[in-house]
Amino acid sequence: MSSALQVVCLSSLSLIGVVQCQNASSNANHSSSIQDLPSYMQYINATRNDPSPVTLNIDLNDKSARNSTASDLYGLMHEDISHSGDGGIYAELLANRAFQGSNYNSTAIPGFNGSLIGISENPVEATAPVLTAWAPIGEDVRMTLDRLHPVSKALPTAMEIDFPLDADGEVGFQNFGWWGMDVSPQEYQVSFYVLGNYPRNQANLTNFHVSLRSNLTGEVYATSTISDVAVPYIDYLKLSTTLHPNMTAPSSNNTFVVSFDGDQVKGQTYYFGMFSLMPETFMDTRNDLRKDIAEAFYDMKPSFLRFPGGNNLEGLSPQQRWKWWETLGPLVDRPGRVGDWGYYNTQGLGLMEYLQWTEDMDIERMLAVYAGFSLDVYGQSGASYPEDQMHVILQEALDELEFCMGNTSTYWGARRAALGHPEPFPIKYVEIGNEDWFSSTYSYRWPYLYNGLKEAYPDIQYISSAYDENEYYNISIPAGEVWDTHHYEEPSYFIRNFDFYDHWQERTNNSGVEVSLGEYSAIQIDTPSGIVNYSFPADLHIFYPRLVSALAEGVYLLGMERNPNVCKFASFAPSLQDLNWYNWTPDMIAFDADPSHTVLSASYWQQWLFAHYRGHETLPVTNTEGDFNPLFWVATIDNEKNAVYVKVINTLNTSVPLTVNMPQKYQSINGTILTGADLNSYNYIYNQTEVVPKPINFTNAPVTYSSSSNGTFQWDVPRYSLNVLEFGL
């Protein structure tokens, strides 16, 4: 996706309080029916208006005609976009916890070439630290930023709190979180660093009161006191405690408070840095993943995770690229970086956290390594490492792989062990760069990095981030490796290209090369031109994945399932979106600070269904009546369950008769359907189940159903539906 096309919610440049920006949930007519929609939104352009019957003969006898399915086809892609990392799946509840940097927005400015930083949270120095999300408590309590007392080399900015000489009652400060924070019965881990000012330090012992409170009523949900602290003035002291609320707050509009007795701290100055408020995390491990979001991912049964990007891998300059080694170790030693998507990245979600994520979910790692090309606020035409300096980038990638997989006798393997994981993290897949068709230099960067990495790690499968997209050159991808292609399209594109991967290797002279659909989504409704408008006009743009998205994307993925010798991976992107700040829509999962607001989209449920019913081998299917479009199908067999899965999608606005013939009697038939009131149905905060999988009751359904002893099944496939039929043999 293009980083120059940011759709940043500018109202969220101010994080203080809970300010939800205008988005699809706030101004869409959620109750509209298909009768209210314009005619062009009631059908898919590429669908043939032909409800003629379809008859499929599934061959169970000729095992030589089967192909093994792509076992890793369905997976996840994650980069920190739309606050999907900080404020998202990274469970940290405090915004701007270490005063590392601030938000910005690149935009075109009349009279200048390309884009520039047009709006920045810090008006003097773009991306520089700010006090956003923090506020003082108590009359005349002064809060400023301080660079004279750095917490660490990585974190040079602290927060200075000056208490007036007449301080009385409760004084202190609070953090409003990422547009609020969830408070519920669980254990919260709290830590922060504090330092005193020597001339003002009165050498008394201080009580630190830590609490979670309602930002609306002031009600205290949990509190803890760290008593009799002798605050030092040379080296920072790290304080830690836990909080245990015994109730669920009625909303997420809550705050984290550090407070004092004014009489105890009057006239003093303290410096604070590197705060953390961490709830219980997914599987209670060191992955630091927010439970509800991680559980939604886990429930999809993904096979891989592509990380850490995406554009966010590349940086807005080579200096601001994702430097994996800076994401390791204690949080106080992680400097963070200017992210590609308009906000500073804390890098709390670092390389070790990503690796732990994959280990906890038992999925393969698709590690994307920096390939010597960075973006720029100007646009996509960023800087590339010259060929005579590519050895630096190759060594970075080799070191990263040594960190992941090296034994403990190696430098980086020992570093991994010192961080608590002596066992290696096996890496099967490495992607070299991201969307390098935007660059004019991948023609030398790809072979340089590929050859160097292949020599050192010959068993890894390498993924090229470009092939034929750049009009000036094609990339030669060796047999056994993978091409990563990205598609943000109209629904009809996916349907018209259902057969794109049929004979793809032969047609393109790419013998032995496989394909990864690394990013995809239906991004706008069908238009006469079929051209995606990346300015995202509201009347065309799809903000939340709709039923039409799930159907069209599903058809394209059926085309991939039919070609497992070519199609290796598929991952929807972007995967996550904070409803208060988004750079890009649609996204697979939308969320805010309240876990009950996490929305699993129609596209999520499409991939959930396909991943749950994969099968081990594809089955040969002959259509003796009818053809593809408006019905699309694929059949696989699950050898462990001794079951046949038939995935059938109907993209027409009326039912289509289907007959399935098998050479033997089936013992049972079960089905699951994904559909909705109309093509534009979608899930949102206040109706999260508009488009969700539901079991098919064949005997009581308002469609014709019959089965016979010879393995014949007849059913009218409902209009606008994605279905999985399970035949128990």
Task: Annotate each predicted stretch with a short phrase.
Residues P279, P308-N311, D376, T408-S440, ...:
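Active-site groove signature of glycoside hydrolases
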Residues P630-K665, G671-G676, S721-V724:
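Carbohydrate-binding surface patches
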Residues P245-T248, N253-V257, F282-P302, Q347, ...:
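An active-site-proximal structural segment forming one wall of the substrate-binding cleft
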Residues N254-T269, R416, D436-L557, N563-V566, ...:
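Noncatalytic carbohydrate-binding groove/subsite architecture in carbohydrate-active enzymes
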Residues D80-I81, Y90, F99-S102, L313, ...:
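Aromatic/acidic polysaccharide-binding cleft in carbohydrate-active enzymes
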Residues Q22-N311, G315-T346, E364, G382-H391, ...:
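Extracellular and organelle-lumenal recognition/adhesion modules and their flexible linkers in secreted
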Residues S276-R286, V332-G348, A371-F373, G379-H391, ...:
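The substrate-binding groove and active-site-proximal loops of carbohydrate-active enzymes
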Residues M1-A24:
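Fungal secretory targeting signals
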